[in-house]
Regions:
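Extracellular loop and loop/strand-boundary signature of outer-membrane beta-barrel proteins
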Residues: 49-53, 93-96, 142-148, 185-192
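Residues that define the transmembrane beta-barrel architecture of outer-membrane proteins
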Residues: 27-29, 57-63, 99-105, 150-156, ...
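Outer-membrane beta-barrel channels and translocator barrels
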Residues: 26, 70-72, 114-119, 165-169
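Short glycine/proline- and aromatic-enriched beta-strand/turn motifs that initiate or cap beta-hairpins
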Residues: 21-58, 62-68
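Residues on the lipid-exposed face of transmembrane beta-strands in outer-membrane beta-barrel proteins
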Residues: 33, 63-69, 107-113, 126-130, ...
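Transmembrane beta-strands of outer-membrane beta-barrel proteins
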Residues: 29-33, 84-86, 105, 120-128, ...
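Transmembrane beta-strands of outer-membrane beta-barrel pores
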Residues: 35-41, 69, 90-94, 128-136, ...
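Repeated loop/turn-to-beta-strand initiation elements of outer-membrane beta-barrel proteins
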Residues: 41, 73-76, 168-172
Length: 198
């Protein structure tokens, strides 16, 4: 299973800029789709098997759809910070029936850290938003869940990835992704949930 997950992860973070167009202010528009298999970090007994099914919770699969925009590299301020992009995203996180499959809405920003060539670069991206639809702690129906205490949580994510420009319209990305879900102690219990994807 781990080997299969590793093989899948090589192509898991595929970003497909479906279109880009030039408008009067020289802005490039992009649409990206990602698939990120992830491991749940066992930071709580509930995740290690302390639940009704006596089941260790190991995996998460996240699917995202993102809209991004950026200045063309040859036009200022794009020339100052080449390759910087920002936008909005929508994600579905597939966990299990005890945690549910929440939907995240978030803002993101990213940029190259190092350009190895005109087509290959090392990049970062951060996401900040909200995740909706958790099966949170409930004294009657989900009493063992001390991880998520509410239906809505904050969603924070940081990615480090290699981008390979296949053409003007298509990129292939592969890297690592760390995510955190928490309601910021607005309700208890709230130990939070952490995942790591590749």
């Amino acid at each position: 299973m781990d080997l299969r997950l590793s093989v899948i992860s090589i192509v898991a973070m595929i970003a497909l800029p479906v279109f880009s167009q030039e408008d009067s202010i020289k802005t490039v528009h992009r649409i990206a789709a990602d698939a990120v298999p992830a491991t749940i970090f066992h930071t709580n007994e509930f995740l290690r098997g302390g639940n009704e099914e006596i089941r260790t919770m190991n995996h998460d699969m996240t699917f995202t759809l993102k809209y991004a925009f950026m200045n063309r590299d040859e036009v200022r301020p794009g020339a100052i910070h080449q390759g910087v992009y920002q936008g909005v995203g929508l994600a579905r996180h597939e966990f299990n029936r005890w945690l549910a499959n929440p939907i995240s809405v978030y803002l993101f920003q990213g940029a190259p850290i190092v350009n190895f060539s005109r087509r290959v670069s090392l990049n970062y991206e951060w996401n900040l938003g909200m995740a909706f639809g958790w099966n949170g702690y409930d004294e009657q129906s989900n009493p063992e869940n001390k991880v998520i205490g509410s239906k809505v949580t904050a969603y924070i994510d940081a990615d480090l990835y290699v981008r390979w420009m296949l053409s003007k319209a298509f990129d292939l990305n592969a890297g690592i992704s760390l995510s955190h879900f928490s309601n910021g102690n607005t309700t208890y219990p709230n130990m939070g949930l952490n995942t790591g994807g590749i």
